[in-house]
């Protein structure tokens, strides 16, 4: 029995970046042998074991043979005769198909180290085309390593394009699409996930709602980039510089989804795109089974972002109503996420923008939350009268703040 460190841990060691987790491959062993050594089996479709002390994953070396369409259509062989090279051959990219033995020697049958040096994301073999999830994984790795200068190899992009044309992506299940997309939202350059899918025509199949934004014009006075798809990616990029939270980044990306539904004759204006966007976001989240917290934040940002931007033009009563509608008084941290997504929208154009709306909204909220029911209960207010009195008191707070703010702006 021989044990090898494999995959991402080897890749990241060679890149000199922190190793998040270690995966191991066991060659020349049986499930029974590992169980005798107190490893605990956790794999359902093929033998994966947890080390009795480190709890790291140890998988028996295996080969995979395509037997049916889709992610689960594989027959696995994990017999003792499977070699390390055969196990590495089934992996997606050469940079993920390297191993190290217990002495630290590199085993690299598919030139992964060379591709690391050349900063290429290249498929190991034509077997790449057997698994549609790999298109998503390549896009995710593009988002992870873009800041290091990595790019997708031309032949790999062509293979991905061929998979799209052959309809292989139709076999993707919603959970896997969202799993890879969500992971990409946590990376340094989440916009590269979308760009990579678009470059091989996969975005049209996987995320048609976002793909439809490309080619839709925006008013030039507000968006120098003009194209709504480009603007959405710029907003996503800006949000990734403001927040590491994938919820915020998701909301920033889809905030203008409704503009894809604007009739051509109305371009470049998009009246009502906010509410139209909420419908499309709900449908997208239902289709891909995206968690409710992502959906709810994205819907709120889509609906409210224009009013957030033009706070100085709103009446105090409208401002308080907006804060009530987004539950800002009970959930100020949620409102903070909304503000970040809106700030990303404003700053995405690349101009030197000072988004003072964030400061103003925070000042308004901090004063309004000081208005509590107890103040009015001791005065004898009851029931709905308490709620109305609190509302009016908050409106008065906003009036004072706006008066002071506008006088300072002069």
From Swiss-Prot:
Disulfide bond entries: none
UniProt key word Ribosomal protein: no
Textual note on the cofactor: Magnesium is required for nucleotidyltransferase activity. Nickel for phosphatase activity.
Binding site for CTP: 8, 11, 91, 137, 140
Catalysed reactions, semicolon-separated: a tRNA precursor + 2 CTP + ATP = a tRNA with a 3' CCA end + 3 diphosphate; a tRNA with a 3' CCA end + 2 CTP + ATP = a tRNA with a 3' CCACCA end + 3 diphosphate
Pfam families: HD (PF01966), PolyA_pol (PF01743), PolyA_pol_RNAbd (PF12627)
Cofactor: Mg(2+); Ni(2+)
Molecular functions (GO terms): ATP binding; CCA tRNA nucleotidyltransferase activity; cyclic-nucleotide phosphodiesterase activity; magnesium ion binding; phosphatase activity; tRNA binding
EC number: 2.7.7.72, 3.1.3.-, 3.1.4.-
Superkingdom of origin: Bacteria
Sites where the protein binds Mg(2+): 21, 23
Domain HD residue range list: 228-329
Key words of the record: ATP-binding, Hydrolase, Magnesium, Metal-binding, Multifunctional enzyme, Nickel, Nucleotide-binding, Nucleotidyltransferase, RNA repair, RNA-binding, Transferase, tRNA processing
Protein residues bound to ATP: 8, 11, 91, 137, 140
UniProt cross-references to CDD domains, sorted A to Z: HDc, NT_ClassII-CCAase
PANTHER family on file: MULTIFUNCTIONAL CCA PROTEIN
Domain description: Comprises two domains: an N-terminal domain containing the nucleotidyltransferase activity and a C-terminal HD domain associated with both phosphodiesterase and phosphatase activities.
Subunit structure: Monomer. Can also form homodimers and oligomers.
Miscellaneous note of the record: A single active site specifically recognizes both ATP and CTP and is responsible for their addition.
Main function: Catalyzes the addition and repair of the essential 3'-terminal CCA sequence in tRNAs without using a nucleic acid template. Adds these three nucleotides in the order of C, C, and A to the tRNA nucleotide-73, using CTP and ATP as substrates and producing inorganic pyrophosphate. tRNA 3'-terminal CCA addition is required both for tRNA processing and repair. Also involved in tRNA surveillance by mediating tandem CCA addition to generate a CCACCA at the 3' terminus of unstable tRNAs. While stable tRNAs receive only 3'-terminal CCA, unstable tRNAs are marked with CCACCA and rapidly degraded.
Protein's name according to its UniProt entry: Multifunctional CCA protein
Biological source species: Legionella pneumophila (strain Lens)
